[in-house]
Amino acid sequence: MFKLACPSCGAEVVFRSATSAMAVCEYCRSTLLREGDAVRDAGKMAVVLEDYSPIRITTSGMYAGKAFGVVGRIQLRYDDGFWNEWYILFDDGSAGWLSDASGQYAVTTDSGEADDTPPFGQIVPGGQYAWEGVSYTASDIRTARCTAGEGELPFQVGPGWEARVVDYRQGVRFLTLDFSEGSRPRRYVGKAVGLGDLRCQLLREPAEIARSAGHLKGKAAALACPACGASIDWRPAVAAHLHCPACGTESDASAGTLEVMEARRREALAATTLALGDEARIDGQDWTLIGLMKCRETGAADEWTEYLLYSEGAGFLWLVESSAGWDKVRVLDAWPESVSASAVRYEGTAYTRMQAYGSQVTYAAGAFNWRVKVGDSVSITDYRGSRGTLSSERSPAELTWSLAQRVPAATVDGWFSKKGKVSAASTVAAL
């Protein structure tokens, strides 16, 4: 451990890791570059936007039999959203990263340079990469910029620093190729995890998150639509991309104020069975409906509605309403063990391929944890098994897997205390 006084304000700054190259003074936000037993002030670092993450500097946990503590963070923003990378220090002196993106987590450690990879610009979602006998599938391809940071970090970053990264998955295995520096990417290897798996201590409590999320210190977010003035129901930093239900204007609230991303003509409100702000009790957790979007099958007439729910204790959940009924949908942290042209195996269960089709967003309202745009399209492949429907969704930059389980309309009625309204709407839709 290395302690010294901040050359800008005099406050104590601690380097807990011998490999940390920089630290951000928590009092004056000066970026301090370590040079031997001294530091150099490299200017101010932007303040991090407090978001929905329960993690903070000083959070501790266990991974692979080793205790760790969180000592730093960078926030990275891409065109359609942002995520956190937490720098963690293990009790044996080694270090790693805890990735935190919309409630999905992964721990990775540096395994050195990779010299057997395709160029960054040639990698596509679903592409394969083999390492140590395991074939990984590309899940995310991102060019992002650093917008803020805090604590200790192993290299110098600042506003404008650009990251080019590709994430790969296989089951719970997780691998990142970082093309940000040098002629060859660095390879980080680990696995997808839940906070419960890490046995985390000193997490932020839900009430604390609700008080601070979405606010820069000293600033509060505006909640009036910048285009028409209508009120937008927004849970700060839980979801930074907003669609006005009155005029359809798309706004970005990630910087603490509402900024118009795309103005749209005033359009009629879409009729939906559930409404923004509806509250439910599902699986012992309280949920609030924060966003909804209507989708249509590409080149066909089939339509459905997807509802995004948020819980302070459990994160995000989707409910999908279609002419076939209701489904509760969970985005998967652990991916299928095997995928072929006709079947998928996930957690020991076989799923048979049913259909492949395109989906296009035709309407969006409320708040989302990524940028949703009318016209967005993805390619979907459905697989049916005894535990539900397993689906892959592929866009130009991302591949995700989700598991949908059929839910009776009467159960949805009970969750939302709708007194038969959901069941009645489902009966009409099925006619």
Task: Describe each PLM feature range.
Residues 1-431:
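Mixed-charge, low-complexity intrinsically disordered regions
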